[in-house]
Amino acid sequence: MSPIEKSSKLENVCYDIRGPVLKEAKRLEEEGNKVLKLNIGNPAPFGFEAPDEILVDVIRNLPTAQGYCDSKGLYSARKAIMQHYQARGMRDVTVEDIYIGNGVSELIVQAMQALLNSGDEMLVPAPDYPLWTAAVSLSSGKAVHYLCDESSDWFPDLDDIRAKITPRTRGIVIINPNNPTGAVYSKELLMEIVNIAREHNLIIFADEIYDKILYDDAEHHSIAALAPDLLTITFNGLSKTYRVAGFRQGWMVLNGPKKHAKGYIEGLEMLASMRLCANVPAQHAIQTALGGYQSISEFILPGARLYEQRNRAWELINDIPGVSCVKPRGALYMFPRIDAKRFNIHDDQKMVLDFLLQEKVLLVQGTAFNWPWPDHFRIVTLPREDDLEMAINRFGRFLSGYHQ
């Protein structure tokens, strides 16, 4: 019998956050080892529970949530999203401009599949959240990575963006606040990106899932509000700010001129209809979440868990000889640099695998985020301070005797 192979469409599709190193971690757990997983931004397992009123509203609406809904989502949920963005300066957004999906991840794939033809290019940051690159590849497109500058607080390199635009470039992806670096972009920088998109007729895809997880004096600006004359698609959801990642509730919002994008919108509607609708019971969480008390503020202020965990992790990482890290101003991650020459590191996946096997702590290598050099890794700052201290101290101990 001939072997059954995966489709050739998947040859260039990678998502190493849940890749080979995670498989090895699962093997270790099956053997009875306890593995501290710092690879996924999943708030609930680290004690960040959803607000009670969100859970109560979902439960109360279960009797009326047993059937399908509109393929774009419940009207009440989409109206709440519409009002949320109108209050943030996107005054022309209507209910019909909003698509609710089974998490932002599903919508990213739909947005790329509806747009890209073979060989079309999409500008994606390096480092990025790797689903963006994977979705472009799955959609027969080519992800062209523009560099973000570590020496400039991980802001995008505007000259590199300009240099990588070609006649095949269809759009640009902006992840703000950024995963994995924690950068929060200034209004001035966003306006520069808007000007580039305007000059080259690019669609802007704005991943803003961490827009309320901000530290110190960081301020988030929605790029769509700065570019009312450009087609911008904004992605957000409940997973991070409202701590219900398992509910799989995300949305995308179309803003700007849409008449010239009629064909693209028809494609989005077709793909939305093909999967019938998003999870209906969980959609009842959206109106309550957006309209109620924003409890995330209890975790991001000085003295609160996320704030103090970020500070402690940053201090400990920078105390390790040969390791440095730009202090994140948003999101749930750090993206430290390792002196690759000092440790003779030429394969960062091997490094995190060796660390896992020795110390039973799971990290993600920097190249998994389409960073071109093997000199970074990502760590999640969701664990309590004592767990972060244990993990980072183990990493320092590991590096002290490590060479490839």
Please tell me what each predicted stretch does.
Residues V144, D149-H220:
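Active-site phosphate-binding strand-loop segment of PLP-dependent enzymes
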Residues L28-E31, S139, E199-H200, L230, ...:
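Helix C-cap/helix->beta junction micro-motif
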Residues Q287, G303-W314, C325-D339, W373:
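Conserved glycine-rich beta-strand-loop-beta hairpin in the small C-terminal domain of fold type I
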Residues A114-V136:
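Conserved PLP-anchoring active-site segment centered on the Schiff-base-forming lysine
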Residues A225-A304, W314-E315, L399:
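Conserved core segment of the aminotransferase class I/II
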Residues S2-G103, Q110, C277, A289-Y293, ...:
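N-terminal small-domain helix-loop-helix segment of the aminotransferase-like
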Residues L138-V144:
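A short helix-loop-beta submotif of the ANL/AMP-binding
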